[in-house]
């Protein structure tokens, strides 16, 4: 590695470290009694991580498992008056304070039949049949992903059943951890494909949406590619997988073109969230031969503008939503009240992701700073 690249890596790792600096070193998934006035978010997790043998609060490690495991976690979130919406409030020390911190009320290992029963029970109890599958990115421990999904669902008030697909990221900020995570992403595409097949087969599930972040987009797009090829060969139609949201995708833009081509016209509707000031993706671009990453393209420039429109991909350019000190890589989640909530509203109204007009886009209230493409 050249000296300039080494410096860039160190700077970028320091930048990304700030996003995780508040989390405790040990796992936080130890059951603790909640208190009145907090919100409880159930998370149903599916993973191909190994079970943790060293930290009971971790549940699952960053090592790869040969089999898929399941878990059910209930996360307590403090009142909005006691927290900054769009962020996870990590406890400074365990067990934490439920009045100000995210906390775990219950965390259980479950089997596949109980997972299916839990989804059915959640659908019946809430009257909801829409499932949101979250696929996290690089540098995520199991509890990172659990708390982030709980925050997204809570802050967006999304009317969904939250399912976490968490793949074996080591949750470390080292270059070799990045390459390990990338190979883990490759390792996990079949497991995600199987989960999507399983969810869409449930009679209790009416619709599935996937929300992928960063390197999780690679897992997602590869799983979608595999499903599309297999479904096309089998003649499968009327898939319940309707929408896919690609947030800051750490994916080679040339590879994305080939993935789209293999998916064909019967693929799910797609929306893309990009930021041209994303330092994490700038680092990734340098590592992977200076080829643009899908998450940092300028959708107003050719050939992207025409390609995205031709493929009916709705694009949200979040670059100009920048605030001093914010993390561009997580911007869509931190601006959750304006971005994810808008998507939630569209889903609740039964509209497709590309049926909106800029004139009625709630984000135009921010000064017409979001680009939307598609037709």
Predicted regions and their residues:
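Bacterial N-terminal signal peptides that target proteins for export
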Residues: 1-9
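C-terminal motif of bacterial Sec signal peptides marking the signal peptidase cleavage site
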Residues: 16-19
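Lipolytic serine-hydrolase domain surface
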Residues: 21, 25-109, 117-118, 125-126, ...
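Alpha/beta-hydrolase fold active-site loops
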Residues: 130
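The conserved beta1-alpha1 loop
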Residues: 133-137, 213, 248
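Short substrate-entry loop that stabilizes the transition state in hydrolases
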Residues: 140-145
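Gly/Ala-rich beta-loop-alpha elbow adjacent to hydrolase catalytic centers
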Residues: 192, 212-216, 220
């Amino acid at each position: 590695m050249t000296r300039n690249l080494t410096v860039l890596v160190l700077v970028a790792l320091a930048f990304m470290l700030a996003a995780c600096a508040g989390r405790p070193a040990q796992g936080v998934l130890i059951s603790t009694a909640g208190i009145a006035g907090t919100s409880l978010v159930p998370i149903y997790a599916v993973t191909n991580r190994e079970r943790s043998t060293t930290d009971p609060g971790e549940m699952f490690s960053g090592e790869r498992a040969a089999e898929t495991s399941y878990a059910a976690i209930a996360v307590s979130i403090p009142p909005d008056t006691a927290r900054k919406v769009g962020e996870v409030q990590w406890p400074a020390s365990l067990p934490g304070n439920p009045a100000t911190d995210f906390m775990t009320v219950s965390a259980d290992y479950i089997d596949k039949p109980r997972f299916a029963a839990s989804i059915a029970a959640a659908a019946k109890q809430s009257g909801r049949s829409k499932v949101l599958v979250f696929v996290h990115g690089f540098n995520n421990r199991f509890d990172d992903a659990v708390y982030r999904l709980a925050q997204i669902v809570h802050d967006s008030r999304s009317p969904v059943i939250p399912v976490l697909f968490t793949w074996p990221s080591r949750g470390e900020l080292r270059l070799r951890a990045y390459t390990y995570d990338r190979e883990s992403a490759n390792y996990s595409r079949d497991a995600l494909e199987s989960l999507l097949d399983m969810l869409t087969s449930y009679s209790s599930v009416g619709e599935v949406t996937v929300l992928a972040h960063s390197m999780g987009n690679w897992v997602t797009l590869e799983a979608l590619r595999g499903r599309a090829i297999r479904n096309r060969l089998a003649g499968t139609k009327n898939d319940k997988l309707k929408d896919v949201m690609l947030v800051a995708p750490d994916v080679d833009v040339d590879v994305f073109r080939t993935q789209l081509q293999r998916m064909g016209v019967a693929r799910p509707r797609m929306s893309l969230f990009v930021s041209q000031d994303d330092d994490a993706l700038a680092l990734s671009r340098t590592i992977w031969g200076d080829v643009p990453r899908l998450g940092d393209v300028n959708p107003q420039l050719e050939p992207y503008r025409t390609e995205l429109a031709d493929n009916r991909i709705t694009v949200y350019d979040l670059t100009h939503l920048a605030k001093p000190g914010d993390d561009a890589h997580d911007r869509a989640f931190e601006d959750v009240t304006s971005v994810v909530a808008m998507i939630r509203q569209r889903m609740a109204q039964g509209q497709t992701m590309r049926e909106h007009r800029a004139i009625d886009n709630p984000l135009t209230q921010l000064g017409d700073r979001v680009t939307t493409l598609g037709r």
